[in-house]
Design a protein with these regions (language model features):
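Short loop/turn elements at secondary-structure junctions
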Residues: 2, 57-115
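Conserved short "hinge" loops at termini or chain/domain junctions
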Residues: 1-61, 103-115
Length: 115
């Protein structure tokens, strides 16, 4: 992901999650960045880039998956402390989490030719 796009997604994520983007030493900001990095790595892995792709081509391509990276980061951030749960019920509050794989809809891996 290119630096400008990364800065944009961080601001958007902070706005949605109510995190102060200027307090980069705050625990919630650090957690968000860790979840963003995890999401970027997951999309990279799902894309299965060929060896011919250099870092610039990968970064440019990842910009096309802004929405997937955004959704996956939100998913991972909101699952903090509830990893592995698919639903949660406490004091009359019911939560059902979507599947993590739904965040990968539209992420198409590169195919490899077997010789």
């Amino acid at each position: 992901m290119n630096d400008d796009t990364r800065a944009e997604i961080i601001l958007d994520l902070c706005a949605v999650l109510g995190i102060n983007a200027e307090q980069t030493e705050a625990d919630d900001y650090k957690l968000l960045i860790a979840k963003l990095n995890t999401a970027i790595r997951a999309i990279k892995s799902a894309r299965n880039y060929p060896a011919s792709y250099n870092d610039k081509k990968i970064a440019d391509d990842l910009d096309n998956y802004y929405a997937n990276i955004f959704d996956l980061t939100i998913y991972e951030y909101n699952q903090t402390g509830a990893e592995g749960e698919i639903s949660h019920n406490e004091n009359g509050t019911n939560r059902t989490y979507k599947s993590r794989t739904e965040c990968f809809v539209g992420v198409i891996p590169f195919a490899r030719r077997v010789m």
